[in-house]
């Protein structure tokens, strides 16, 4: 109360001290005095001109904001680099999918930066990140930053159209993604860079100079990132934040937010939220660690994620924080609350933690205001950090400061203020929140204020506290917060207007708080005239009865909004009202609308347009529990919730789904997942899913039974202990437990003991150079002790034949044999009862592992290595249920499982499983063949959806081929897809094959058939443990159903596992592949992001290859209909089952291969089908000869001794040879993720700059020595390694230098740069010693390989030349495939056609027709290289082929290889005195050796500069030109018709025999095509070979000099005739025949 004493001109302020502080009272009094004086001095001034700021306020503000905010003028990457230098080995990232140290993160981000710089990324160029939460997010952000670009992380939960709008707004054409999200990324950008997956930390480091991106001009005012917020115009706004802004904010936040160097900051926030940037980038400049949970853990089990990652610091919105109990976060020290206003109850809930309140709008960096949470006032925000200053101004006029304590608009000053909105045309307008000019009051209060200071009007209403702290008081506009996300109602309204305007519907948006959750309510009205009226003058607001027309409009609007806006911005309900009220100011009267909505029952809000259906009332316990949970979370009466009630149509959203999950354990429903709620939103469906888990628990497997007491699963424990001690040869005290084997294990042991399967499957892991081997062993020991399955052995009871598992103590079994390597399949341990089932060896950096098939399935072995990788990095080994829990569950549920399978198969047709038709046991062989196709698929909600489509497609094939509607085939069940959480976490062989019965009902629609299949499979998943053998014992029909001939396997395309401690891709043993030999036909579908590889694995002795090809073609055809967009309109009967690809076949070959020898048969190594009209049945037979010896350490090539191709080779033989070598190369290829990591080290210039070491073969030959010369003389190449045949290094070097001197270029100055390795191309590992081979294969020593070496011999057989010419090429190609950043150039020979347009099969026919083994070896060697290049992804084209014609000497020296065919032919004609005039108009490709060698080296250094896989060396001459050049040299020759010339050649050959120049090629004389005398043959050379006129002139000069050289050395006769002895002195190159 203010008391004025007019006589004394004194005013007294009376106040309640319990509500107003003395400081507040003083400021009120000072303000009153200032206002009163102002009015008294000028009573006629306008109200807005009255001064309200007192001197007390001015003095206090001067004190608080005396200094300008501190700006850090530094780029982010410089601060990060400092941290890397200080603590390179400290953990930078700990994530669900792996971890990185600071050094490793620096390394990988630098590789990515180099790649981005090559793509043109630089300052202020934006790159988007399209990836779900994983450890590669920091790599992507840092890589972009180091390239001097700016990033924007996309929230993939948002609609694709909104993501496209963001990319368009940023003008971003490049996105970085992971394999999981690459399909989405390709829809957003023209250039996609894929990183991540299971790719490892690369230990093989490149040179430090190459490890960092090239320096470019970076500046602190360059853009760092952009984050998008809601915009009132209908489009999101992109805030552009600069380096100096974020760095200033982050460094100033570290101390106030209590971030310590050893903290682990939880990366929780969505990428649409600017806090997500803070969570990633701030830890990396403070020395802390980013803790990244999986998206699944983040939504479903945040408590477990925090515990597993050891997070100590987290930032959550209050809405999320109140879902959890703080006691469930023991590792958490600090909790920051932000994004929305915290309630005092939130602060009280988390008072056991250090709770910090944070604030800042996205336009001012993530955080700039913070303070310890105030339990008494949830509006408390904290104080400004040193990077910014806070001012309170008049909401209507920012040029007017308000008194301390007054509520006004919060204005932020400092470097933290963003540059602007991306491409904002209104940036400089007065309405822009970014203030362009410094306010006068700031200059008055602070004399040193710079003119360039940045200010931002937040739109938030706030007030000062007495200590400069800030209190949030609301918004001055209609902007709202939904789940912490800023939302402009205007954006929603704008989009709704554009959708509904054609329907003449008005729209308005309000937000209601309903039971602690913000809901957007949309009002629509047909009476758009109401918008123009005054709400005070129109009638009562009321809900209009819904019409079909309005409902359709709303449904359409909702659908469109979901495509263009995030789900949280789509209205929860639409209310159709009689009109939209407006206020006196002409704006929508939202206050009245809000009051009207709040007056309605909540059920009414949800029922009006949602068509709420309740259905039957719940009956089961699970149904009643879910009804109660729905009611509690959604605030709806239970009697309004029935079996048909849909969680989301009742008003639920993603946040309330998390609340539902948090409530589930209290209701005893612990096995419902976040995805389950979205997948089964109807109460009845979610209850059914929950009941499956409950059934499992009742049967003895769940949380209450996760611990089984030792020996409790056997009856006579003591006698079994004695038996086990004897069979295992161990002490009784070392036996920890004994329990029965599962039916699956018993079956595996039975087959293993009988020798029908390989019992132990083995693999090897090469340790990284920096890895501590003791630490690796210690980690394995810890895993061995923690995982009882690894310590399990198997014994057999002699009396009953029962198999038991014995868990023993002790340490892991290490094989101490230093010589043998048991990790090879052929030398693996035999199946032994009582022996160790896991064996390991660690020798010379190689960890070899052998594990029995009875102990694992595919999931288990991958998870084991993931767990060990985490433990190696310091994470605790996960606690998993023991396998005896599963054994107990399987034993207790035998009755229920038997009942299920009896009911399922009791009336099955006795012939339902007989496709393909069974064969007798005697005729069954173990000869496996493979065929493969690739089909385009789009992975839908989950792989289960696709699996149902595959199963229906296969059922339709069986029906079409047997005409039986009752179909049974086998399916491989993981045992985990629909299991409880405990089952999913168990290590052990849970996966098994069970029969699936499908009844074809033609009247059923495809959608219904798929839904039924999926339901059947989910129900069946609970009982797969019974096993095929026991199911078959349930009756005659069940036994017949278990005689399955076909098994269908559907599994994801998982990348090769790679770890932080081992360097090579681990091709893990695959259980499903191993089981394929037990069935006549296995169809394996490997599902990728946008395609599926479908393999048929079959017994080719009894199932013809052509029939399997037809089956695959038919499968593709049927699947295309079921998977297609029109499938929902199809009935099962309308599916076309005809194999349409046969319709266009003019005739079908009846010739079938008589044998398919123990091989791997692929239709094509790229998994694409051959032409359906192929008419080469012999090719099928020849291709079946492919045998591939699989070694997990190195893809090798082996041939059955009985499989040597007959000579001369046919075209089918050549194709078979190509397939064999190509398969070896294909298996050497690493995973797509590791390909990417290698690619990151490459740029378009990386092969033309920097340090290079080049490896050259054939360096002592005619062409090879010139290649060596250009390598040694090229300044870009620092080191050259030449492989030369020789018994010692000295001999090899001597041969190399001798060749160089013969070519007239050697100088001793070349010695320092040259290293010569003795070897032999015909030998394994090229005949190199172990050290040299390791250097060649280590991925770091060699940057490029030039493979020129070959054995050139016209008389030897193919088999004699194969090892040198083909085998060596295959070995080098495997190295190149395994290391995609290795440049590989193969020097090949030319054929008539354009080499890049040449088709393989016609070429094979042509090459076979020549009957020349040398040419055939070159063709076979070249073809796998061509196929490999075709398989490589875009940008991975480091493999090139140089295709040569005839090579002559250079223009200066003319030194040639005198044994080349061209010179022998010319010598023959000179000697005869005549030449073939019939070939004069024909053209031959010819090049000089210098130009040729130079082109080869240039290609090796810069393969990207050669756009096609094959580079032909252009240039050539007409034969008439050649003869003119020869005669111009003084050689007298007469032109003769072909027949006369041939007669002369035959006569001379007969007379001179071995002294004749063509004697060694006499078998080719009759082949006119080889002598180029076939009319028209020469003209068949494609234009790709022909050079320009300058090339031709240079070529003529080189040709003359070569002829002169041959005359000088005596190969061609001189002026007095040719040397009679035919000897050529040592100046020319020769071949040994």
Curated annotation (Swiss-Prot):
A GO CC annotation given for this chain: cytoplasm
What is its biological role? D-lysergyl-peptide-synthetase subunit 3; part of the gene cluster that mediates the biosynthesis of fungal ergot alkaloid. DmaW catalyzes the first step of ergot alkaloid biosynthesis by condensing dimethylallyl diphosphate (DMAP) and tryptophan to form 4-dimethylallyl-L-tryptophan. The second step is catalyzed by the methyltransferase easF that methylates 4-dimethylallyl-L-tryptophan in the presence of S-adenosyl-L-methionine, resulting in the formation of 4-dimethylallyl-L-abrine.
**Region feature Reductase (R) domain, mapped onto this chain:** 1256-1483
InterPro entries found in the cross-reference section: ACP-like_sf, AMP-bd_C_sf, AMP-dep_synth/lig_dom, ANL_N_sf, CAT-like_dom_sf, Condensatn, Far_NAD-bd, NAD(P)-bd_dom_sf
Q: Where is the Carrier domain?
A: 622-691
Q: What is this protein called?
A: D-lysergyl-peptide-synthetase subunit 3
Ranges for region Condensation (C) domain? 836-1127
Report the source organism. Claviceps purpurea (Ergot fungus)
Pfam families on file: AMP-binding, Condensation, NAD_binding_4, PP-binding
Q: What metabolic or biological pathway is this protein involved in?
A: Alkaloid biosynthesis; ergot alkaloid biosynthesis
Please quote what the entry notes about the protein's domains.
Answer: NRP synthetases are composed of discrete domains (adenylation (A), thiolation (T) or peptidyl carrier protein (PCP) and condensation (C) domains) which when grouped together are referred to as a single module. Each module is responsible for the recognition (via the A domain) and incorporation of a single amino acid into the growing peptide product. Thus, an NRP synthetase is generally composed of one or more modules and can terminate in a thioesterase domain (TE) or reductase domain (R) that releases the newly synthesized peptide from the enzyme.
Keywords on record: Ligase, Phosphopantetheine, Phosphoprotein, Transferase
What EC number(s) would the UniProt record show?
Answer: 2.3.1.-
Q: Where is this region: Adenylation (A) domain?
A: 80-483
The Swiss-Prot or TrEMBL record describes its family as follows:
Belongs to the NRP synthetase family.
Which terms under GO biological process does the entry name?
amino acid activation for nonribosomal peptide biosynthetic process; indole alkaloid biosynthetic process
According to the UniProt entry, its GO molecular function terms are:
ligase activity; phosphopantetheine binding; transferase activity
Post-translational modification O-(pantetheine 4'-phosphoryl)serine, affected residues: 654
């Amino acid at each position: 109360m203010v008391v004025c004493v007019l006589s004394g001109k004194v005013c007294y302020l009376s106040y309640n001290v319990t509500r107003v502080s003395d400081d507040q009272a003083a400021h009120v009094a000072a303000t009153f005095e200032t206002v009163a004086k102002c009015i008294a001095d000028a009573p006629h001034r306008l109200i807005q001109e009255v001064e309200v700021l007192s001197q007390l306020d001015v003095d206090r503000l001067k004190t608080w904001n005396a200094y300008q905010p501190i700006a850090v003028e530094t780029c982010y990457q410089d601060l990060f680099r400092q941290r890397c230098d200080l603590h390179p080995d400290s953990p930078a990232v700990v994530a669900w999918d792996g971890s990185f140290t600071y050094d490793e993160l620096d390394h990988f981000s630098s590789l990515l930066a180099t790649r981005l710089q090559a793509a043109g990324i630089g300052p202020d160029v934006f790159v988007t990140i399209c990836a779900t939460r994983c450890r590669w997010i920091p790599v992507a952000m840092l890589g972009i930053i180091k390239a001097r670009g700016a990033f924007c992380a996309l929230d993939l939960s948002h609609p694709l159209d909104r993501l496209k709008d963001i990319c368009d707004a940023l003008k971003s054409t490049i996105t970085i993604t992971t394999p999981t999200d690459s399909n989405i990324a390709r829809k957003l950008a023209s250039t996609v860079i894929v990183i991540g997956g299971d790719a490892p930390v690369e230990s093989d480091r490149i040179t430090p100079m190459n490890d960092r991106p090239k320096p470019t001009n970076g500046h602190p005012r360059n853009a760092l990132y952009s984050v998008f917020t809601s915009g009132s115009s209908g489009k999101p706004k992109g805030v552009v934040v600069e380096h100096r802004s974020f760095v200033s904010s982050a460094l100033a936040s570290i101390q106030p937010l209590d971030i310590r160097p050893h903290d682990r900051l939880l990366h929780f926030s969505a990428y649409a939220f600017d806090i997500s940037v803070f969570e990633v980038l701030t830890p990396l400049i403070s020395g802390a660690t980013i803790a990244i949970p999986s998206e699944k853990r983040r939504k479903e089990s945040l408590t477990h994620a925090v515990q597993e990652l050891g997070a100590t610091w987290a930032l959550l919105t209050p809405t999320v924080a109140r879902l959890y109990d703080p006691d469930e976060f023991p590792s958490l020290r600090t909790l920051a609350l932000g994004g929305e206003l915290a309630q005092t109850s939130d602060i009280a809930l988390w008072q056991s933690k250090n709770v910090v309140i944070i604030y800042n709008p996205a336009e001012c960096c993530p955080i700039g205001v913070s303070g310890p949470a105030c339990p008494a006032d949830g509006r408390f925000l904290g104080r400004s950090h040193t990077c910014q200053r806070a001012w309170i101004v008049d909401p209507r006029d920012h040029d007017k400061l308000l008194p301390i304590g007054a509520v006004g608009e919060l204005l932020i000053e400092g470097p933290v203020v963003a540059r602007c909105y991306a491409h904002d045309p209104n940036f400089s307008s007065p309405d822009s929140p970014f203030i362009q000019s410094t306010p006068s009051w700031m200059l008055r209060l602070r004399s040193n204020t710079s003119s360039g200071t940045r200010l931002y009007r937040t739109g938030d209403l706030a007030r000062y506290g007495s200590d400069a702290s800030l209190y949030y008081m609301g918004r001055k506009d209609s902007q709202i917060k939904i789940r912490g996300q800023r939302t402009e109602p205007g954006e929603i309204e704008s989009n709704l207007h554009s959708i509904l305007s054609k329907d003449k519907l008005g729209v308005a948006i309000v937000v209601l708080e309903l039971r602690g959750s913000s809901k957007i309510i949309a009002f629509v009205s047909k009476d758009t005239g109401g918008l123009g009226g005054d709400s005070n003058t129109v009638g009562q607001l009321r809900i209009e009865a819904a019409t079909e027309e309005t409902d359709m409009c709303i449904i359409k609007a909702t659908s469109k909004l979901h495509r263009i806006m995030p789900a949280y911005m789509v209205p929860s309900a639409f209310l159709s009202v009689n009109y939209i009220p407006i206020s006196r100011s002409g704006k929508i009267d939202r206050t009245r609308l809000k009051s009207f909505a709040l007056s309605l029952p909540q059920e009414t809000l949800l029922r009006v347009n949602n068509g709420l259906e309740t259905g039957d009332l719940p009956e089961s316990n699970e149904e009643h529990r879910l009804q109660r949970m729905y009611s509690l979370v959604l605030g709806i009466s239970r009697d309004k919730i029935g079996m048909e009630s849909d969680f989301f149509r009742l008003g639920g959203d993603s946040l309330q789904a998390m609340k539902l999950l948090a409530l589930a354990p209290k209701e005893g429903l612990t096995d419902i997942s976040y995805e389950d709620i979205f997948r089964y939103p109807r109460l009845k469906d979610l209850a059914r899913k929950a009941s499956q888990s409950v059934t499992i628990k009742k049967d003895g497997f769940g949380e209450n039974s996760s611990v089984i007491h030792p020996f409790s699963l056997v009856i006579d424990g003591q006698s079994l202990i004695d038996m086990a001690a004897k069979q295992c040869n161990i002490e009784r005290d070392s036996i920890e437990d004994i329990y029965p084997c599962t039916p699956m294990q018993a079956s595996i042991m039975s087959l293993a003991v009988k020798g029908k399967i390989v019992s132990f499957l083995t693999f090897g892991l090469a340790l990284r150079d920096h890895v501590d081997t003791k630490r690796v062993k210690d980690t394995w020991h810890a895993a061995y002790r923690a995982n009882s399955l690894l310590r399990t052995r198997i014994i057999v009871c002699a009396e009953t034949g029962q198999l038991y598992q014995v868990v023993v103590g002790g340490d892991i079994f290490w094989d101490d044999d230093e010589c043998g390597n048991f990790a090879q399949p052929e030398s693996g341990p035999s199946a032994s009862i009582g022996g160790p089932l896991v064996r390991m060896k660690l020798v010379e950096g190689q960890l070899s592992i052998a594990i029995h098939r009875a102990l694992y399935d595919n999931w288990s072995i991958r998870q084991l290595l993931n767990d060990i990788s985490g433990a190696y990095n310091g994470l605790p080994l996960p606690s998993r249920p023991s396998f005896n829990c599963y054994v107990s569950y399987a034993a207790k549920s035998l009755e229920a499982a038997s009942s299920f399978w009896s009911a399922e198969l009791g009336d099955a047709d006795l012939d339902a499983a007989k496709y393909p038709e069974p064969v007798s046991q005697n005729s069954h062989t173990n000869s496996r063949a493979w065929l493969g196709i690739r089909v385009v698929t789009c992975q839908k909600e989950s792989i289960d959806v696709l699996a149902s489509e595959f199963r229906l497609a296969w059922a339709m094939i069986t029906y079409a081929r047997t005409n039986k509607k009752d179909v049974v085939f086998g399916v491989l069940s993981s045992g985990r897809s629909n299991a409880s959480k405990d089952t999913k976490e168990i290590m052990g062989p849970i996966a098994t094959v069970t029969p699936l019965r499908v009844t074809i009902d033609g009247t059923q629609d495809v959608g219904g058939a798929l839904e039924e299949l999926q339901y059947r499979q989910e129900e069946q998943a609970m009982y797969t443990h019974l096993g095929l053998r026991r199911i078959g014992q349930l009756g005659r029909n069940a036994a017949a159903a278990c005689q399955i001939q076909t098994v269908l396997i559907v599994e994801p395309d998982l990348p090769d596992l790679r770890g932080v401690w081992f360097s090579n891709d681990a091709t893990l043993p695959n259980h499903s592949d191993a089981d394929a030999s037990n069935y006549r036909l296995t169809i394996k579908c490997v599902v990728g992001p946008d395609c599926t590889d479908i393999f048929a694995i079959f017994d080719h002795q009894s199932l013809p290859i052509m029939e399997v090809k037809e089956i695959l073609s038919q499968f593709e055809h049927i699947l295309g209909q079921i998977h297609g967009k029109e499938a929902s309109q199809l009935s099962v009967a309308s599916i076309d089952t005809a194999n349409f690809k046969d319709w266009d076949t003019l005739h079908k070959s009846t010739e079938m291969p008589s044998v398919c020898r123990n091989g791997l048969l692929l239709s094509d190594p790229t998994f694409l089908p051959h032409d359906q009209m192929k008419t080469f049945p012999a090719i099928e037979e020849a291709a079946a000869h492919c045998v591939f010896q699989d070694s997990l350490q190195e893809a090798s090539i082996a041939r059955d001794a009985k499989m040597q191709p007959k000579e001369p080779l046919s075209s089918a033989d050549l194709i078979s040879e190509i397939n064999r070598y190509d398969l070896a190369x294909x298996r050497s290829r690493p995973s797509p993720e590791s390909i990417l990591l290698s690619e990151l080290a490459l740029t378009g210039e990386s092969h033309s700059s920097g340090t290079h070491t080049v490896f050259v073969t054939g360096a002592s030959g005619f062409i090879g020595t010139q290649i060596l010369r250009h390598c040694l003389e090229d300044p870009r190449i620092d080191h050259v390694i030449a492989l030369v045949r020789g018994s010692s290094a000295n001999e090899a070097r001597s041969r190399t230098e001798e060749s160089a001197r013969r070519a007239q270029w050697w100088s001793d100055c070349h010695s320092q740069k040259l290293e010569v390795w003795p070897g032999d191309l015909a030998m394994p590992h090229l005949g190199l010693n172990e050290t040299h081979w390791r250097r060649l294969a280590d991925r770091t020593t060699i940057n490029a390989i030039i493979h020129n070496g070959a054995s050139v011999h016209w008389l030897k057989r193919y088999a004699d030349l194969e090892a040198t010419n083909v085998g060596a090429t295959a070995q080098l190609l495997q190295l190149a495939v395994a290391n995609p950043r290795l440049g590989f150039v193969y020097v090949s020979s030319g054929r008539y056609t354009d080499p890049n347009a040449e088709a393989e099969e016609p070429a094979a026919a042509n090459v076979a027709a020549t009957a020349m083994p040398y040419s055939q070896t070159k063709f076979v060697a070249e073809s796998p290289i061509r196929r490999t290049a075709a398989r490589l992804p875009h940008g991975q084209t480091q493999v090139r082929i140089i295709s040569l014609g005839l090579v002559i000497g250079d223009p200066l020296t003319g030194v040639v290889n005198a044994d080349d065919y061209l010179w022998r032919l010319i010598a023959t004609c000179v000697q005869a005195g005549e030449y073939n005039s019939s070939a004069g108009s024909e053209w031959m490709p010819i090049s000089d050796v210098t130009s040729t060698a130079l082109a080869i080296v240039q290609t090796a250094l810069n393969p990207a500069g050669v756009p096609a896989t094959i580079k032909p060396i252009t240039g050539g001459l007409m034969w008439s030109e050649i003869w003119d050049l020869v005669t111009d040299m003084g050689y007298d020759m007469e032109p003769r018709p072909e027949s006369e010339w041939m007669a002369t050649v035959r006569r001379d050959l007969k007379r001179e025999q071995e002294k004749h120049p063509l004697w060694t090629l006499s078998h080719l004389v009759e082949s006119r095509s080889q002598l180029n005398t076939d009319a028209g043959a020469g003209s068949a050379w494609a234009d790709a070979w022909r050079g320009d006129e300058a090339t031709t002139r240079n070529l003529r000069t080189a040709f003359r000099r070569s002829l002169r050289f041959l005359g000088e050395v005596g190969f061609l006769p001189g002026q007095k005739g040719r040397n009679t002895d035919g000897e050529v002195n040592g100046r020319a190159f020769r071949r040994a025949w």
